[in-house]
């Protein structure tokens, strides 16, 4: 509340807030759990990389990892071998992520449109990373039906 008073929410109230882009904590059995998948940009922005907390975390991790892994290559002369090693390194990491079920895809290519002659002469190299972390399972729907025809089969009639 505005005055700082804590409020206990049930699942329905947490879901209502989550539909407005507000993640909450709710009590589940004896523990508190984060309830909600969306970042504060939702529902205005529905781009999965911005809207889902787990996807945003993956993108942040991928970016930080790329920067840290390649920091030592800055200020070194670029050549075909170094360029390919950057791409190969990311793609090997991506293959591991995909084979471990962390994401559906993860690959890097040199951005041929941005790697113009002027950019290359200036020492600016551009890459494009395609990655698809799995979105959260927000809702599960299950329809049940009484199948009376099974009685005939079960009773051998």
What do the predicted segments below correspond to?
Residues 87-91, 95, 115, 119, ...:
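Short alpha-helical interface elements
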Residues 119-136:
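Long, well-structured alpha-helical subdomains associated
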Residues 62, 108-110, 127-129:
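Generic structural hydrophobic/aromatic packing signal, biased to beta-strands
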Residues 5, 13, 104-106, 125-127:
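Structural beta-strand/beta-sheet cores of well-ordered domains, especially the beta-sheet scaffolds
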Residues 101-123:
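Long, charged, glycine-rich C-terminal linkers/tails
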Residues 84-106:
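Short, hydrophobic/π-rich interface segment
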Residues 1-86, 132-157:
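Long, contiguous, structured domain-core segments that constitute the functional module of a protein
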Residues 18, 48, 94, 111-117:
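Residue-level detector of functional hotspots within protein domains
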């Amino acid at each position: 509340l505005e005055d700082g008073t804590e409020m206990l929410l049930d699942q329905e109230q947490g879901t209502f807030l989550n539909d407005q882009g507000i993640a909450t904590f709710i009590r589940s059995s004896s523990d508190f759990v984060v309830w909600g998948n969306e970042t504060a940009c939702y529902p205005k922005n529905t781009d999965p990389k911005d809207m889902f907390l787990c996807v945003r975390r993956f993108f942040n991790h991928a970016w930080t990892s790329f920067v840290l892994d390649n920091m030592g290559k800055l200020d070194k002369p670029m050549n075909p071998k170094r360029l390919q090693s950057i791409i190969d390194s990311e793609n090997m990491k991506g293959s591991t992520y995909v084979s471990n079920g962390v994401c559906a895809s993860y690959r890097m290519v040199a951005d041929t449109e941005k790697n113009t002659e002027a950019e290359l002469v200036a020492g600016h190299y551009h890459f494009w990373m395609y990655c698809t972390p799995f979105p959260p399972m927000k809702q599960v729907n299950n329809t049940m039906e009484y199948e009376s025809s099974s009685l005939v089969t079960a009773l051998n009639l």
